[in-house]
């Protein structure tokens, strides 16, 4: 069978034109802070010969412009995790962006239909599918509103409130659901299905936890940078302006997959007792002898007590303080000036410096302290997050530190730390429902918290699970009352407030687009349709009059 004929001169011209187009695109102010480690030629070679323009890229441009304005005004786009089209349409009236939470999808929208806690063990297309669900709803309600408005005169439209239903969506990419190729494909899914931005965290796939669970395992700094590069490369191949948010879970992380990256060395714990046996071998031996459960756990606890677990710089400082030196503080300063959270000093270099200062080696073994799964013990914290945030910044539009508490001082330390190296870096903040807000701060401070954070550079802030919690509260309250007072519960606590507050869903047929679809039917049947949904007899006409009992 003969091959399809192609004009190689035209092929070459098309390629060179694409390269020039990509180069011009990358010169736009949008990319002034973005570092790419590949060339325009690399991207052009990996593109299809058929150019596809993705609507989500327009949404990404819109989101970038929105955040630029917030950054300029020291304000923030603040939003929450949306569960469904009802929530998205109501949010659009008041908020300028939409969030899609992996946690919410895990519990309510897995494509396997199997609910789960936030372990990112749902199928890879789960969150992209939810994005598409909400994106299609946004497009539908935008079309519906547009037709409704254009059926009015210009004078009537000027008096009619307008809702921008096309609020940009930022979605949860978890850890990327695998290696680099998985991240490339996941990014493509998000672009195709309507996301304006995505966030990805530096936890290890397979052990990923909700940011407010224990047992988080980090990947090395460079491994996460590779993920960020993969996201940008995938978006570049698709010609998308997709925003990338780099999340770090290092503030509370306790484990690390590998010590290959010297930037992590400062935060790795090791045994300082030379008599400490290898923990993993000790645990394996105990299991082979039939020891399990609490007894096995007690072996690890006892080992930890005797091992003298410390960070290397702590071990060195202890040696100085316990030694016979007259200038201890000067020696400590000499060491910590070169070995600190942001110095990126390797353990090898730190050992050499300690030997010069002390005249001897400091015993420190991070291998014997490894967990039974092989992970290294890690002691994160705010400065660890700053280190990682600084490393990720050139490859991401926003940086997010997952935190254990809504601690303004900590948020300030992180913001100032990242901005010390990257002054124009945008930041994101999780206003998590996992925090006990009423214990953390009084109501007056809750009210100003978003504003205070925005002044530090947190341009995008979000309550991950507010969609879930508001639904739970509303349904629990209604179900309780309904069980006791029957239809009075619906009439007085649902329908009456809907009417009073002007919540358009009270006319759910109209909200669902029945009039819009009737218009389509009439358009294709010559203007008449006996099966129109909103014709004579529709019960929604009752809402044109004063509701009974009001």
UniProtKB/Swiss-Prot annotation:
EC id: 4.1.3.1, 4.1.3.30
Pathway the protein takes part in: Carbohydrate metabolism; glyoxylate cycle; (S)-malate from isocitrate: step 1/2
Any single Gene Ontology cellular-component annotation: glyoxysome
Active-site positions on this chain: 210
Catalytic activity line of the entry: D-threo-isocitrate = glyoxylate + succinate; (2S,3R)-3-hydroxybutane-1,2,3-tricarboxylate = pyruvate + succinate
Record: residues binding Mg(2+): 172
MF-aspect GO terms: isocitrate lyase activity; metal ion binding; methylisocitrate lyase activity
Subcellular location: Glyoxysome
Keyword annotations: Glyoxylate bypass, Glyoxysome, Lyase, Magnesium, Metal-binding, Peroxisome, Tricarboxylic acid cycle
Transmembrane spans: none
Top-level taxon in the UniProt lineage: Eukaryota
SUPFAM superfamilies named among the record's database cross-references: Phosphoenolpyruvate/pyruvate domain
Protein's GO biological process: glyoxylate cycle; tricarboxylic acid cycle
Binding site for substrate: 101-103, 211-212, 247, 430-434, 464
A Pfam family it matches: ICL
Protein purpose: Catalyzes the formation of succinate and glyoxylate from isocitrate, a key step of the glyoxylate cycle, which operates as an anaplerotic route for replenishing the tricarboxylic acid cycle. Required for growth on ethanol or acetate, but dispensable when fermentable carbon sources are available. Also acts on 2-methylisocitrate.
Assembly: Homotetramer.
The family this protein is said to belong to: Belongs to the isocitrate lyase/PEP mutase superfamily. Isocitrate lyase family.
Stated name of the protein: Isocitrate lyase
The organism of origin for this protein: Debaryomyces hansenii (strain ATCC 36239 / CBS 767 / BCRC 21394 / JCM 1990 / NBRC 0083 / IGC 2968)
């Amino acid at each position: 069978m003969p091959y399809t004929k192609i004009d190689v001169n035209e092929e070459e011209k098309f390629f060179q034109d694409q390269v020039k187009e990509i180069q011009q695109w990358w010169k736009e102010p949008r990319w002034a802070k973005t570092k790419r480690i590949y060339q325009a030629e690399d991207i052009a070679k990996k593109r299809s010969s058929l150019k596809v323009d993705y609507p989500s890229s327009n949404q990404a441009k819109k989101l970038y412009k929105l955040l630029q304005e917030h950054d300029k005004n020291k304000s923030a786009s603040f939003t929450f995790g949306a569960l469904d089209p009802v929530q998205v349409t109501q949010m659009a009236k008041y908020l300028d962006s939409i969030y899609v939470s992996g946690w919410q999808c895990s519990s309510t929208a897995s494509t396997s239909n199997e609910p789960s806690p936030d372990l990112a063990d749902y199928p890879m297309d789960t969150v992209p599918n939810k994005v598409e669900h909400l994106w299609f709803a946004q497009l539908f309600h935008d079309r519906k509103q547009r037709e409704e408005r254009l059926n009015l005169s210009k004078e009537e439209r000027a008096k009619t409130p307008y809702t921008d239903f096309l609020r940009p969506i930022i979605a949860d990419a978890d850890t990327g659901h695998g290696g680099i190729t998985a991240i490339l494909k996941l990014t493509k899914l998000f672009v195709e299905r309507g996301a304006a931005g995505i966030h990805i965290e530096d936890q290890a796939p397979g052990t990923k936890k909700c940011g407010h669970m224990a047992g988080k395992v980090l990947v090395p700094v460079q491994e996460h940078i590779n993920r960020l590069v993969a996201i940008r490369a995938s978006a570049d191949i698709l010609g998308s302006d997709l925003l990338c948010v780099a999340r770090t879970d290092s503030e509370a992380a306790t484990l690390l997959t590998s010590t290959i990256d010297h930037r992590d060395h400062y935060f790795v714990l090791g045994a300082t007792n030379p008599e400490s046996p290898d923990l993993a071998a000790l645990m394996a031996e105990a299991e082979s002898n039939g020891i399990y459960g609490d007894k096995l756990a007690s072996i690890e606890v006892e080992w930890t007590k005797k091992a003298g677990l410390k960070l290397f710089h702590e071990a060195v400082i202890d040696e100085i303080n316990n030694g016979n030196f007259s200038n201890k503080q000067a020696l400590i300063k000499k060491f910590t000036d070169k070995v600190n959270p942001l110095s990126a000093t390797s353990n090898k270099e730190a050992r050499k410096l300690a030997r010069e200062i002390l005249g001897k080696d400091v015993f420190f073994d991070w291998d014997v302290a490894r967990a039974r799964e092989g992970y290294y013990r890690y002691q994160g914290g705010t400065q660890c997050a700053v280190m990682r945030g600084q490393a990720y910044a050139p490859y991401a539009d926003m940086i997010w530190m997952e935190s254990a508490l809504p601690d303004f001082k900590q948020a300030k330390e992180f913001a100032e730390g990242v901005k010390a190296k990257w002054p124009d870096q945008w930041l994101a903040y999780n206003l998590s429902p996992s925090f006990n807000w009423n214990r953390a701060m009084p109501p007056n401070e809750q009210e100003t918290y978003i504003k205070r954070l925005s002044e530090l550079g947190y341009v995008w802030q979000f309550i991950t699970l507010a969609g879930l919690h508001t639904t739970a509260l509303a349904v629990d309250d209604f179900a309780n009352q309904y069980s006791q007072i029957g239809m009075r519960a619906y009439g007085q606590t649902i329908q009456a407030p809907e009417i009073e507050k002007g919540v358009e869903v009270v006319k759910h047929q109209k909200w669902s687009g029945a009039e819009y679809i009737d218009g389509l039917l009439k358009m294709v049947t010559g203007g008449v349709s006996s099966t129109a949904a909103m014709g004579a007899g529709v019960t929604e006409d009752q809402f044109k009059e004063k509701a009974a009992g009001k």
